[in-house]
């Protein structure tokens, strides 16, 4: 697997649960196959959108195994990050053993290391696990940005081949792209609403929430942008804009799970402490999805 694999659309997969909050592996398998058939470029299970924070280690790896087994021709990039370096290393090693093609590692959260500690954390995993790895900057959840200098330094590691940008700061993303463009390094949007401007700066695609429910349109948008057809890409951005915004009207993945239920893809059941979507937001989401079907 080369860094070129990290170009295009990679759905941050939801995880289906039954009414007792058990993982529904049969539906998960169907979901993975549906996304592959829609033309996505890879799958990202057990990330934030997949509710990895509520899973045991064994459940986490079972989800990876199910997705790996379900698909034929697209890479599986398993979430394996933690705020505990030993835990991140264990999850990464087990994901590799389960057949993952690559790893997505959120930056350490809650204990909020300084840049030196963050770089050591990532290098420890990259030195030990011989898979391509994407570092994930989402300060709204972790409490701290990955410093640009840290990202630039990590881009020199042969196993660290990508950066998921979810800070909402286009200047920061642009600087990372500019300073790593000579490296074996790809920058992917982690915010659907910013995918188009990030690609315009030199990004290579997205790890997408919206692609769970609108994979074909998301693939078309990203494909047009990567081909330089920004007129078509803008048209698709306008079509999907309300969806991008509504999927974050409450904490992700609450709205996307409701959307999956509305589209009869899987149940909206989530694990506690996530709550069902508020009624007024449910109606707003229903209208957005209905507009996309007209």
UniProtKB/Swiss-Prot annotation:
Active site, renumbered? 136 (proton donor/acceptor), 164 (schiff-base intermediate with substrate)
Under the heading Pfam families, the entry gives: DHDPS (PF00701)
Keyword Isomerase appears in the UniProt entry: no
Pathway assigned in UniProt: Amino-acid biosynthesis; L-lysine biosynthesis via DAP pathway; (S)-tetrahydrodipicolinate from L-aspartate: step 3/4
Kindly give the Gene3D superfamilies that the UniProt entry links to this protein. Answer: Aldolase class I
Question: Which terms in the GO cellular component ontology are assigned?
Answer: cytoplasm
Q: Which keywords annotate this record?
A: Amino-acid biosynthesis, Cytoplasm, Diaminopimelate biosynthesis, Lyase, Lysine biosynthesis, Schiff base
Q: Which domain of life is it from?
A: Archaea
- What EC identifiers does the entry list? 4.3.3.7
Q: Which InterPro entries match?
A: Aldolase_TIM, DapA, DapA-like, Schiff_base-form_aldolases_CS
Q: Write out the GO MF terms.
A: 2-dehydro-3-deoxy-phosphogluconate aldolase activity; 4-hydroxy-tetrahydrodipicolinate synthase activity
Which top-level enzyme class is recorded in the Swiss-Prot or TrEMBL entry?
lyase
Subcellular location, principal: cytoplasm
Q: Which reaction is recorded as catalysed by this protein?
A: L-aspartate 4-semialdehyde + pyruvate = (2S,4S)-4-hydroxy-2,3,4,5-tetrahydrodipicolinate + H2O + H(+)
The positions annotated as site (Part of a proton relay during catalysis) read 48, 110
Task: Give the binding site residues for pyruvate.
Answer: 49, 207
Q: Where is this gene product found? A: Cytoplasm
UniProt cross-references to SUPFAM superfamilies, sorted A to Z? Aldolase
Q: Does the keyword Ribosomal protein apply?
A: no
Q: Which BP terms in the Gene Ontology apply to this protein?
A: diaminopimelate biosynthetic process; lysine biosynthetic process via diaminopimelate
Q: Tell me the function of this protein.
A: Catalyzes the condensation of (S)-aspartate-beta-semialdehyde [(S)-ASA] and pyruvate to 4-hydroxy-tetrahydrodipicolinate (HTPA).
Q: Which family does it belong to?
A: Belongs to the DapA family.
**Subunit details for this protein?**
Homotetramer; dimer of dimers.
Protein known as: 4-hydroxy-tetrahydrodipicolinate synthase
Source organism of the structure: Natronomonas pharaonis (strain ATCC 35678 / DSM 2160 / CIP 103997 / JCM 8858 / NBRC 14720 / NCIMB 2260 / Gabara) (Halobacterium pharaonis)
Q: What is the lineage of its organism?
A: Archaea, Methanobacteriati, Methanobacteriota, Stenosarchaea group, Halobacteria
Q: Which gene encodes it?
A: dapA
């Amino acid at each position: 697997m080369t860094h070129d694999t990290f170009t295009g659309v990679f759905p941050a997969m939801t995880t289906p649960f039954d009414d007792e909050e058990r993982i529904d592996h049969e539906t998960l398998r169907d979901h993975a196959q549906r996304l592959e058939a829609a033309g996505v470029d890879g799958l990202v299970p057990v990330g934030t959108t997949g509710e990895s924070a509520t899973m045991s280690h064994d459940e986490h790896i079972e989800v990876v195994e199910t997705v790996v087994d379900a698909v034929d021709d697209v890479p599986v990039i398993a979430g394996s990050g933690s705020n505990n370096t030993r835990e991140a290393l264990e999850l990464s090693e087990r994901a590799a053993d389960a057949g993952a093609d690559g790893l997505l590692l959120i930056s350490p959260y809650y204990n909020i290391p300084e840049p030196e500690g963050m770089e050591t954390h990532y290098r420890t995993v990259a030195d030990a696990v011989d898979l391509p790895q994407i570092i994930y900057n989402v300060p709204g959840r972790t409490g701290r940005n990955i410093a640009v200098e840290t990202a630039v330094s990590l881009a020199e590691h042969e196993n660290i081949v990508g950066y998921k940008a979810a800070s909402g700061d286009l200047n920061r993303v642009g600087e990372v792209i500019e300073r790593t463009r000579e490296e074996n390094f790809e920058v992917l949007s982690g915010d659907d609403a910013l995918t188009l401007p990030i690609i315009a700066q030199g990004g290579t695609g997205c790890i997408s929430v919206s692609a769970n429910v609108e994979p074909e349109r998301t693939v078309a948008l990203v494909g047009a942008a990567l081909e330089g057809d920004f007129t078509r890409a803008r048209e698709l951005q306008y079509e999907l804009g309300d969806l991008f915004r509504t999927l974050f009207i409450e904490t992700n993945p609450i709205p996307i799970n409701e959307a999956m239920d509305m589209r009869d893809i899987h149940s909206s059941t989530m694990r506690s402490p996530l709550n069902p979507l508020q009624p007024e937001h449910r109606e707003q989401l229903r209208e957005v999805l209905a507009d996309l079907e007209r």
